[in-house]
C-alpha cells in the first residue's frame, strides 16, 4: 500500500496508542468504583452491590444505563452554558493528565519534555471545572463547596508541585520517560521519601478523596458543588474523580517506584500491578480514616506539608551540589 507513508503510519500508531491507553484509563476508573463499593461493604461487615449479574459484575452496566436515562435537569436560574461546560472540563482535564504517563517503553500518548509541567497545568485546569459548577448552579451549597474545593486544591497543588521538584532535580529532566530511566538502579522513593509522602497526601487532597473530601461533605454542604447535577453530567464528575485516582496512582509509580521496571514480568504488567496497589490504598484510606475539619486540613497543608517539601528540596539540592564537587 504505497499511499501509507512512514509519516502517516507514525500518526496512525500514535492515535492507536492514545485511544487504547485512554480507554484503559476510563475502564479502570469505572471498575474502581465497583471494586470500592464491594471492598467498603467487606470492611463495614455488609454486602456490597451483588444483585446485577454474577456477584454484582454487571452493576457498572446498570449504573450506566440509569445515568443515560435519568432526566438531564438544569436549574431554572443557572448559567446554562457554564453549567454544561463544567463536567466536560473536569472529565477532559483529568483524562488528559494521564497522557504524559509512560505505561511501558514506547507506550505513552504524549512524550513531552515538559511532562510534569503539563500534568500540573491539567490539575490546575480541573479547578476551573469546580468553580464553574459551583458558581453556575445558583445554589449556596454548591458555591460554598466550590470555594472550599478551589482553596483546598490550589493550596495542595503547591505542595504537589514542590514535592516533584526533588525528583526533577535528581533526574535532570521534566520528561517522564527520562525520570523512569533514571530509576534503573534505585527507586526515587528511597532518596525522596519525604517527597513521596507529601505527594501522596497532596494527591489525595487534589482528588477530593476521603479524608480530604470537605468540598463534598454531605453533612455540611449536601454533596457540595455538584448537588444540582444529574444524569450524565453527574456521571462525568463521578467518573472523572476515579480517573484522577488512576492518574495520581500512575504518577506515584512513575515518579517514585520505577515505573514499568521490574524483573521477570513484562513492563506493562509491572506498571499495572504497582498502579493497582496504590489505587487500593485510596480505598483503604477511605475505609479507615475519619474526616477532619476544613480548617484542620488547610492548617495541616501549610504548617506541615509545605515545610516538609521545602526541607526535602533543600536537602536534595545540597546533596546534588556536594556530589558535583
UniProtKB/Swiss-Prot annotation:
Keywords: Cell inner membrane, Cell membrane, Membrane, NAD, Quinone, Translocase, Transmembrane, Transmembrane helix, Ubiquinone. One of its GO terms (molecular function) is quinone binding. It is found in: Cell inner membrane. The chain crosses the membrane at residues 11-31, 81-101, 114-134, 154-174, 186-206, 237-257, 265-285, 304-324. Its EC number is 7.1.1.-. The keyword rRNA processing does not apply. The gene is nuoH. Signal peptide: none annotated. InterPro entries: NADH_UbQ_OxRdtase_su1/FPO (IPR001694), NADH_UbQ_OxRdtase_su1_CS (IPR018086). It is a multi-pass membrane protein. The keyword Membrane applies. NDH-1 is composed of 13 different subunits. Subunits NuoA, H, J, K, L, M, N constitute the membrane sector of the complex. Belongs to the complex I subunit 1 family. GO terms for cellular component: plasma membrane. This is NADH-quinone oxidoreductase subunit H. Its main location: membrane. It catalyses: a quinone + NADH + 5 H(+)(in) = a quinol + NAD(+) + 4 H(+)(out). One of its GO terms (biological process) is aerobic respiration. NDH-1 shuttles electrons from NADH, via FMN and iron-sulfur (Fe-S) centers, to quinones in the respiratory chain. The immediate electron acceptor for the enzyme in this species is believed to be ubiquinone. Couples the redox reaction to proton translocation (for every two electrons transferred, four hydrogen ions are translocated across the cytoplasmic membrane), and thus conserves the redox energy in a proton gradient. This subunit may bind ubiquinone.
Amino acid at each position: 500500500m504505497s499511499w501509507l507513508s512512514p509519516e502517516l503510519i507514525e500518526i496512525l500508531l500514535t492515535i492507536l496508542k492514545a485511544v487504547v491507553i485512554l480507554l484503559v484509563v476510563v475502564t479502570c476508573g469505572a471498575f474502581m468504583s465497583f471494586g470500592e463499593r464491594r471492598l467498603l461493604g467487606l470492611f463495614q461487615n455488609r454486602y456490597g452491590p451483588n444483585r446485577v449479574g454474577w456477584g454484582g459484575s454487571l452493576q457498572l452496566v446498570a449504573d450506566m444505563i440509569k445515568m443515560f436515562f435519568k432526566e438531564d435537569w438544569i436549574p431554572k436560574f443557572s448559567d446554562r452554558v457554564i453549567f454544561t461546560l463544567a463536567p466536560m472540563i473536569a472529565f477532559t482535564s483529568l483524562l488528559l493528565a494521564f497522557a504524559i504517563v509512560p505505561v511501558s517503553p514506547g507506550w505513552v500518548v504524549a512524550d513531552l519534555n515538559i511532562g510534569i509541567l503539563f500534568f500540573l497545568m491539567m490539575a490546575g485546569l480541573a479547578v476551573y471545572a469546580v468553580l464553574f459548577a459551583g458558581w453556575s448552579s445558583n445554589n449556596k451549597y454548591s458555591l460554598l463547596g466550590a470555594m472550599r474545593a478551589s482553596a483546598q486544591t490550589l493550596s495542595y497543588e503547591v505542595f504537589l508541585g514542590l514535592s516533584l521538584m526533588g525528583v526533577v532535580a535528581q533526574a535532570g529532566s521534566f520528561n517522564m520517560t527520562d525520570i523512569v530511566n533514571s530509576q534503573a538502579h534505585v527507586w526515587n522513593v528511597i532518596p525522596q521519601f519525604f517527597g513521596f509522602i507529601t505527594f501522596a497526601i497532596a494527591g489525595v487532597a487534589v482528588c477530593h478523596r476521603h479524608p480530604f473530601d470537605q468540598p463534598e461533605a454531605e453533612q455540611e454542604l449536601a454533596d457540595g458543588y455538584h448537588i444540582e447535577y444529574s444524569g450524565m453530567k453527574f456521571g462525568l464528575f463521578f467518573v472523572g474523580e476515579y480517573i484522577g485516582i488512576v492518574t495520581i496512582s500512575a504518577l506515584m509509580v512513575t515518579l517514585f517506584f520505577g515505573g514499568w521496571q521490574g524483573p521477570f514480568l513484562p513492563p506493562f504488567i509491572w506498571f499495572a500491578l504497582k498502579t493497582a496497589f496504590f489505587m487500593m490504598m485510596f480505598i483503604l484510606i477511605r475505609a479507615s480514616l475519619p474526616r477532619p475539619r476544613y480548617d484542620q486540613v488547610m492548617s495541616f497543608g501549610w504548617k506541615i506539608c509545605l515545610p516538609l517539601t521545602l526541607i526535602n528540596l533543600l536537602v536534595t539540592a545540597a546533596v546534588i551540589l556536594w556530589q558535583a564537587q
